[in-house]
Amino acid sequence: MVALSNALSRVFGSVAGYKFPSFIQKGINALYAKIFKVDLSEFEPLENYKSLNALFTRSLKKERPFDKAPNICIAPCDALITECAFLDNDSALQIKGMPYKAHELVGEINPLSPSFFYVNFYLSPKDYHHYHAPCDLEILETRYFAGKLLPVNKPSLHKNKNLFVGNERVALVTKDIQGNRLYFVAVGALNVGKMRFNFDKNIQTNAKARFTQTYSYNPPIKVKKGDNLGNFEMGSTIVLFVQNTAFKDLKEKSVKFGESIGEFHAN
């Protein structure tokens, strides 16, 4: 199953990256936009994308404004928030009734503290696929975990136990403005050709190699709130684990990158 789902995603990625003649590509783009109800009001028009992958990975025409105050945490992406809560004995939910162990997702040996609040951001095929820093961060490590590429939509989350932990994923181990640990996890999914990270081009995802790899940074890589960290090549999921932060009532709400979603407490 692992080989099949990953092979299918590689094939889809190759097809999506193919540049058809312009009149054909325009029709493909228009069909995709119609099926998934893609809103291009902040983006270039459909005819400007030379491949389906170019449409998936489209960039904003203008920078979105966001609160620059250092104590404000912003949404890192355009997404639906499917679950959010404090960890309960190291347990988080991929969806209601489907728990998993947080330390396994991020690659720690010991359970995570109950002071961590987690937020699941589901990026659908219609969404802007880039992900950004939710606050000023120092990136200490990037951990790549090989795995399956199962869908991360709600039916699949209800059906497959430990889906996030079993799927291919990349966990950024970072330090926030207060010096607390913050985990930023990008979870792969079916038909997500690759996950890309702008701060380290060595990170390879959806490759044929089946191993875990750690990239350490000394000194740490410093990024500012709102910086573009990378992108999916179709919809998928971001999971944030944050400490000492008061979040708004977010569950089942759609958010946009740059929207204020929480506030850091003083340590």
Curated annotation (Swiss-Prot):
Record-linked Pfam families: PS_Dcarbxylase (PF02666)
What is the reaction catalyzed?
Answer: a 1,2-diacyl-sn-glycero-3-phospho-L-serine + H(+) = a 1,2-diacyl-sn-glycero-3-phosphoethanolamine + CO2
Database matches in InterPro entries: PS_Dcarbxylase, PSD-B, PSD_type1_pro
Mind telling me how this protein is modified after translation?
A: Is synthesized initially as an inactive proenzyme. Formation of the active enzyme involves a self-maturation process in which the active site pyruvoyl group is generated from an internal serine residue via an autocatalytic post-translational modification. Two non-identical subunits are generated from the proenzyme in this reaction, and the pyruvate is formed at the N-terminus of the alpha chain, which is derived from the carboxyl end of the proenzyme.
Bilayer topology annotation: Peripheral membrane protein
The UniProt keywords, alphabetically, are:
Cell membrane, Decarboxylase, Lipid biosynthesis, Lipid metabolism, Lyase, Membrane, Phospholipid biosynthesis, Phospholipid metabolism, Pyruvate, Zymogen
- Is Nuclease one of the keywords UniProt gives this record? no
Protein name (Swiss-Prot/TrEMBL): Phosphatidylserine decarboxylase proenzyme
Q: Where is the active site?
A: 78 (charge relay system), 132 (charge relay system), 236 (charge relay system), 236 (schiff-base intermediate with substrate)
Cofactor binding note of this UniProt entry: Binds 1 pyruvoyl group covalently per subunit.
User: Which cofactor does this sequence's record say it needs?
Assistant: pyruvate
In-chain residues carrying the UniProt-annotated modification Pyruvic acid (Ser): 236
> Taxonomically, what lineage is the organism?
Bacteria, Pseudomonadati, Campylobacterota, Epsilonproteobacteria, Campylobacterales
State whether keyword Heme applies: no
Can you name the source organism?
Answer: Helicobacter pylori (strain P12)
